[in-house]
Swiss-Prot record:
<feature type="repeat" description="WD 4">
    <location>
        <begin position="376"/>
        <end position="414"/>
    </location>
</feature>
<keyword id="KW-0677">Repeat</keyword>
<dbReference type="InterPro" id="IPR001680">
    <property type="entry name" value="WD40_rpt"/>
</dbReference>
<feature type="repeat" description="WD 6">
    <location>
        <begin position="472"/>
        <end position="514"/>
    </location>
</feature>
<feature type="compositionally biased region" description="Acidic residues">
    <location>
        <begin position="558"/>
        <end position="576"/>
    </location>
</feature>
<keyword id="KW-0853">WD repeat</keyword>
<feature type="modified residue" description="Phosphoserine">
    <location>
        <position position="52"/>
    </location>
</feature>
<dbReference type="InterPro" id="IPR015943">
    <property type="entry name" value="WD40/YVTN_repeat-like_dom_sf"/>
</dbReference>
<protein>
    <recommendedName>
        <fullName>Periodic tryptophan protein 1</fullName>
    </recommendedName>
</protein>
<dbReference type="InterPro" id="IPR019775">
    <property type="entry name" value="WD40_repeat_CS"/>
</dbReference>
<feature type="repeat" description="WD 3">
    <location>
        <begin position="329"/>
        <end position="369"/>
    </location>
</feature>
<feature type="repeat" description="WD 5">
    <location>
        <begin position="420"/>
        <end position="461"/>
    </location>
</feature>
<comment type="similarity">
    <text>Belongs to the WD repeat PWP1 family.</text>
</comment>
<feature type="modified residue" description="Phosphoserine">
    <location>
        <position position="131"/>
    </location>
</feature>
<feature type="compositionally biased region" description="Acidic residues">
    <location>
        <begin position="71"/>
        <end position="91"/>
    </location>
</feature>
<keyword id="KW-0597">Phosphoprotein</keyword>
<dbReference type="GO" id="GO:0006364">
    <property type="term" value="P:rRNA processing"/>
</dbReference>
Length: 576
């Protein structure tokens, strides 16, 4: 199951990601995190004993067994050290695989040798040639995008980090040679490379992931230097932040949400928590994290929304909640959030109170800081986004999409309303490079729909027209997102209840090119101009020049290899 996706723009990833190093400082940090988890487990055990009673022999025996297990460090238990001497591990190329050390466990070239004839045991490391080959395999080029996909399989969750290479050159000799081609290294060498999508590395997550947000800020640094991190929100109330430029990392770089205060040690039991009704907790979330939004203007600020009905603004330097807002959505779940594209003080949120809120976080009085626009009474807002600096889009649990103009007074009727799906909206995306392009998906349906909607005239109430509807064989659709760079302006990823991730270039479809002809031409002209400024040639500027382009979808199969699906004739059965 792919439950959330996001993109990393070109140029932010380290070209050669570093390998995880288990030094003394890292060991101390891990020990602190492990102790918190152990305290959590002990508190859970005490709670279970208190509820079950000591008179139940079966429950007592089970509790004693659990207590004995707690004496074994969780990090060591997976290695089965108690039965280590009883196991026979096959000798592989003169040594055994190293599994004791997180920084070495995933390296098949690192071997442990017992030693012969009284010699001391030792570890053999890869030679310089092997290291260079591995370094090249991990290389991320400046022209590559990363795709972040939150995946759950067999009750275990991961964040998969994909590399998307849009390719180079053109197979067709009809594509004209243009000024600036000689300055592009790939084109100058005559290199022709097809698009490719593959898994670079992955991270194991503590709970089912609900959202993922890319950060260009180095957490805990107080630095303006660009970085490459990901924040993951799950059914747990904490937010984990990981460095995407580090491979084989065992623990996150930062956890937002006061893990100690938010652990079972301090929140003894759910019953006591409900009875006490402590009110607004300002330091951390107490329920699932439903959405996050990184502020591109104030880069040390991350907003999060939760099923605990609050919106929190996090300081990424200290890891603390700088502000907590509890009354924006009338004590209802806050499901979605996004910062304004031009104003870093304005936060857009949607909630289960049927309202969209536009909040100025600089205002201290919560009763005066938000303006509201409402969907139909009883509908729950599932997702919100800016289509432009003045137009808001929101999707609801009944399958409706609403458009509001923030220049109108609050509580005004929507500019238009669209019955997009018969089930609740799970994903709603607006393409920031192609004005008026919108994609939708529903958690109870298997199709992704592409729409064209009026954007330049706020008085146009005609509403969107569907360009196409397509089943990508991902099961019920849970997530989709458009690429963040102009060179891949028409590319989107799609995920659903099936574990495969699909990548689709929408402009390889003839109907899409026809519907957005002028918008595509404008993007191509702009991309060409931007490429020439940096001495390169634009690939998108010369794409889609003929009408016989195959409709292309890239699929990642079970082995993590990409397969390219091509629909002949540039048509598709599900076309509108």
């Amino acid at each position: 199951m792919i439950s959330a996706t996001n993109w990393v723009p070109r140029g932010f990833s380290s070209e050669f990601p570093e390998k995880y190093v288990l030094d003394d400082e890292e060991v101390e940090r891990i020990n602190q995190l492990a102790q918190l988890n152990l305290d959590d487990a002990k508190a859970t055990l005490e709670e279970a004993e208190g509820e079950s009673g000591v008179e139940d022999d079966a429950a007592t025996g089970s509790s004693n067994k659990l207590k004995d297990q707690l004496d074994i460090d969780d990090d060591l238990k997976e290695y089965n050290l108690e039965e280590y001497d009883d196991e026979e591990i096959a000798d592989n190329e003169g040594g055994k695989d190293v599994s004791m050390f997180p920084g070495l466990s995933n390296d098949s070239d690192v071997k442990f040798h017992e030693g012969e004839k009284g010699e001391d045991p030792y570890i053999s490391l890869p030679n310089q040639e092997d290291s260079q080959e591995e370094k090249q395999e991990l290389q991320v080029y400046p022209s590559d995008n990363l795709v972040l996909a939150a995946r759950t399989e067999d009750d275990v969750s991961y964040l998969d980090i994909y590399v998307y290479d849009d390719g180079a050159g053109f197979h067709s000799s009809d594509i004209p040679v243009e000024e600036g081609d000689e300055a592009d290294p790939d084109v100058a060498r005559g290199l022709v490379r097809d698009p490719a999508l593959y898994v670079h590395h992955d991270l194991m997550l503590p709970a089912f992931p609900l959202c993922v947000e890319w950060l260009d800020y180095k957490v805990g640094s107080n630095s303006e230097e660009a970085a490459n991190y990901a924040a993951i929100g799950t059914f747990d109330p904490q937010i984990e932040i990981w460095n995407l430029d580090c491979v084989d990392k065992a623990f996150p770089d930062m956890i937002l949400g006061e893990p100690l205060d938010n652990s079972m040690v301090s929140l003894k039991s759910k019953k006591k928590k409900k009875k006490s009704k402590t009110g607004h907790i300002t330091t951390h979330h107490t329920d699932a994290v439903l959405s996050m939004a990184h502020n591109k203007y104030f880069r040390s600020v991350l907003a999060s929304t939760s099923a605990d009905h609050t919106v929190k603004l996090w300081d990424l330097n200290s890891g603390n909640a700088a502000r907590s807002l509890a009354s924006i959505h009338s004590n209802k779940n806050v499901s979605s959030s996004e910062w304004h594209m031009l104003n870093g003080s304005i936060l857009l949120t949607g909630g289960y109170d049927s309202r969209v809120a536009l909040t100025d976080v600089r205002i201290s009085d919560e009763s005066q800081m938000s303006k509201y626009w409402s969907a139909m009474a009883g509908e729950e807002i599932e997702t919100v986004t800016f289509a432009s600096e003045n137009i808001i889009l929101c999707g609801t649990d009944s399958g409706n999409v609403y458009s509001f103009d923030i220049r109108n007074n609050e509580n005004r009727k929507p500019v238009w309303t669209l019955k997009a799906h018969d089930a609740g909206i799970s994903t709603l995306c607006s393409n920031k490079f192609i004005p008026g392009m919108m994609s939708t998906g529903a958690m109870g349906e298997k199709t992704v729909k592409l729409w064209k909607f009026p954007l330049d005239d706020a008085t146009n109430t005609k509403g969107p027209s569907m360009v196409l509807s397509r089943d990508f064989d991902v099961g019920n659709v849970l997530t989709s997102s458009f690429a963040p760079d102009i060179e891949v302006a028409g590319t989107m990823v799609i995920g659903g209840v099936n574990k495969v991730l699909k990548l689709w270039d929408v402009f390889t479809n003839r109907s899409v090119r026809k519907s957005f002809k002028s918008e595509l031409e404008n993007v191509q002209a702009r991309a060409k101009e931007e490429a020439q400024k940096i001495g390169k040639s634009s690939r998108i500027a010369r794409k889609y020049t003929s009408n016989d382009n195959p409709d292309t979808v890239i699929t990642i199969d079970d082995q993590g290899e990409d397969e390219e699906e091509r629909e002949g004739g540039d048509e598709h059965d599900d076309m509108a």
